[in-house]
Swiss-Prot record:
Pfam families: Pox_mRNA-cap (PF03341). Heterodimer of a catalytic and a regulatory subunit. Intrinsic methyltransferase activity of the catalytic subunit is weak and needs to be stimulated 30- to 50-fold by the regulatory subunit, which is itself catalytically inert. This is mRNA-capping enzyme regulatory subunit. InterPro entries: Poxvirus_mRNA-cap_ssu, Poxvirus_mRNA-cap_ssu_sf. Regulatory subunit of the mRNA cap enzyme which stabilizes the catalytic subunit and enhances its methyltransferase activity through an allosteric mechanism. Heterodimeric mRNA capping enzyme catalyzes the linkage of a N7-methyl-guanosine moiety to the first transcribed nucleotide (cap 0 structure), whereas the polymerase associated VP39 is responsible for a second methylation at the 2'-O position of the ribose (cap 1 structure). The heterodimeric enzyme is also involved in early viral gene transcription termination and intermediate viral gene transcription initiation. Early gene transcription termination requires the termination factor VTF, the DNA-dependent ATPase NPH-I and the Rap94 subunit of the viral RNA polymerase, as well as the presence of a specific termination motif. Binds, together with RAP94, to the termination motif 5'-UUUUUNU-3' in the nascent early mRNA. One of its GO terms (biological process) is DNA-templated transcription termination.
Length: 287
């Protein structure tokens, strides 16, 4: 428990290994690879609590998270720490210290207003911006279309769950020699978003990767039509890399399970009020 509280209050990070050789690429647009236990067993424990929250009416979610949904300023904090003075989201001709893509639903918790759902059997979709592997789209590689000689490539990942995000990180670990994942204090600890910071590009591998992508998309520039789910590797990445990734993501999901459990207990407390011991613990933890 002390470790969970420490991660929430101080943040957590991991440095991923560099691989000189790209994995065999096979880009296919339109569908994400399905989740499996191999890519994070903790998720399947954590998703049970997410489903509990997913069944709650959104007006109640807004009420109980109003004071703990602080503005997500983690990207700004990263810019400050790395002394990044200028960023760009697109445009090869634009000069900047970093090229950035934010795939997260910044400062949002749910997708649309909704009433309560009776039971998990009636859940047909994930209405929360939490643990939704379908949120990872091919936009995660968009910065590479506009990368020239920027010092950093920075991605705000919408989720840490599923094969897609691990395959993506494995590719980035051949495109850049320094790849770090961060879950900052100033990110939302209600959601499983995180930041990837990559630097020291491996030009040879980047050229190989972009050649494959451009041959599949039949375009040398980014097209918005490519902003869809995708799969990119036929074969699973090596177990060593998966475990290194899970070393980081498990810390995040353990913290989220604790936070979500407090929130659910608060929303279902006998007091029938936002003034209850679970909510007080939650506020103390996150504020």
């Amino acid at each position: 428990m002390d470790e969970i509280v420490k991660n929430i209050r101080e943040g957590t990070h991991v440095l991923l290994p560099f691989y000189e050789t790209l994995p065999e690429l096979n880009l296919s647009l339109g569908k994400s690879p399905l989740p499996s236990l191999e890519y994070g067993a903790n998720y399947f424990l954590q998703i049970s609590r997410v489903n509990d929250l997913n069944r709650m009416p959104t007006d109640m979610l807004k009420l109980f998270t109003h004071d703990i949904m602080l503005p997500e300023s983690d990207l700004d904090k990263v810019y400050e720490i790395l002394k990044i003075n200028s960023v760009k989201y697109y445009g090869r001709s634009t000069k900047a210290d970093a090229v950035v893509a934010d795939l997260s639903a910044r400062n949002k918790l749910f997708k649309r207003e909704r009433d309560a759902i009776k039971s998990n059997n009636h859940l047909t979709e994930n209405n929360l911006y939490i643990s939704d592997y379908k949120m990872l789209t091919f936009d995660v590689f968009r910065p590479l279309f506009d990368f020239v000689n920027e010092k950093y490539c920075i991605i705000k990942l919408p989720t840490l769950f599923g094969r897609g995000v691990i395959d993506t990180m494995r590719i980035y670990c051949s495109l850049f020699k320094n790849v770090r994942l961060l879950k900052c204090v100033s990110d939302s600890w209600l959601k499983d978003s995180a930041i990837m910071v990559a630097s020291n590009v491996c030009k040879k591998n980047l050229d190989l990767f972009m050649s494959h992508v451009k041959s599949v998309t039949k375009s040398s520039s980014w097209k918005d039509v490519n902003s869809v789910q995708f799969s990119i590797l036929n074969d699973p990445v090596d177990t060593e890399f998966i475990n290194k990734f899970l070393e980081f993501s498990n810390r995040v999901y353990e913290a989220l399970y604790y936070v979500h459990s407090l929130l659910y207990s608060s929303m279902t407390s006998d007091s029938k009020s936002i003034e209850n011991k679970h909510q007080r613990r939650l506020v103390k933890l996150l504020l």
